[in-house]
């Protein structure tokens, strides 16, 4: 892992020097071909693909090396699924409350996975920013690895619930909807992590973004009872749309196009959360 970090820092220094015109080297002959080491890595347009690859590899190694914490994160899913089974395992068919609990559980899991992942390495991030670290590549590396974690968690949760509960939703669609929910929570967690300066602040913010998902939902009152600003907040809650999708799939006559369309806002929220986190990270300096 240290060799990857040293290599990345070396390339960042080279890029920074190249941009400032401080190379100080002799110009190459017109017919000579620059070596691979002298070529600037392809940025790939939106993000620096070289940095994204190195950062992803480094972050994945860190996640795997911290096997105790990773194991605890992965254990959340089967434990939450077991709780759901203990309540709905003997019920004839799934209820709207079950669907809401499933969505909220995966949103919580995704948010908790990510809420400390930037702030805990704030010093490293700020140091590498001095050497031209690409913020887009950095965020991409986080969501790439955390999405793999979410896939495992959602897979465990989905299989356990579908095995012992009559969810009335095809297992493939159930997994995709819950994965979109978990990734949306992950992106919100990364936004929180980019905006705070201490890990304990990040953890404290998680309930403050989860509880509104409960308050402004059909879990508390009927949708037609929300009025004024509460109605707008009800419509804006990220967890609402995957819940609506599960409700549609759970009906006897499912309108698949409608059910799938309800998942799209979760993906839009994921992009929105990252889009807000990006300038926040770009503005941070020592």
Describe each PLM feature range:
Residues 61-286:
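Membrane-spanning alpha-helical segments of multipass transporters and channels
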Residues 12-13, 52, 108:
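Generic hydrophobic, helix-prone segments enriched in Leu/Val/Ile
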Residues 31-54, 229-239:
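Short, membrane-interfacial amphipathic segments enriched in basic
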């Amino acid at each position: 892992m240290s060799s990857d970090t040293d290599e990345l820092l070396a390339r960042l220094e080279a890029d920074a020097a190249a941009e400032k015109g401080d190379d100080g080297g002799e110009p190459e002959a017109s017919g000579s071909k620059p070596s691979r080491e002298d070529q600037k890595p392809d940025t790939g347009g939106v993000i620096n693909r070289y940095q994204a690859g190195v950062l992803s590899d480094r972050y994945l190694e860190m996640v795997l090396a911290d096997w105790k914490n990773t194991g605890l994160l992965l254990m959340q899913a089967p434990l939450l699924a077991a709780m759901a089974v203990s309540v709905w395992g003997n019920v004839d068919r799934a209820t709207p409350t079950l669907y809401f609990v499933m969505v909220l559980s995966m949103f919580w899991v995704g948010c908790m996975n990510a809420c400390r992942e930037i702030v805990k390495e704030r010093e490293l991030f700020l140091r590498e920013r001095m050497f031209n670290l690409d913020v887009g590549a950095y965020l991409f590396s986080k969501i790439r690895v955390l999405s793999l974690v979410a896939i495992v968690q959602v897979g465990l949760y989905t299989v356990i619930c579908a095995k012992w509960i009559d969810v009335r939703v095809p297992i493939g669609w159930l997994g995709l909807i819950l994965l979109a929910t978990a990734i949306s929570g992950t992106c919100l967690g990364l936004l929180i992590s980019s905006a705070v300066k201490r890990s304990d602040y990040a953890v404290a913010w998680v309930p403050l973004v989860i509880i509104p998902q409960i308050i402004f939902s059909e879990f508390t009152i009927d949708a037609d009872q929300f009025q004024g600003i509460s109605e707008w907040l009800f419509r804006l809650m990220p967890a609402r749309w995957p819940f609506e999708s599960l409700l549609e799939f759970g009906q006897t006559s499912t309108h698949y196009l409608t059910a799938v369309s309800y998942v799209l806002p979760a993906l839009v929220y994921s992009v929105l959360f990252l889009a807000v986190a990006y300038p926040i990270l770009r503005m941070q300096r020592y």
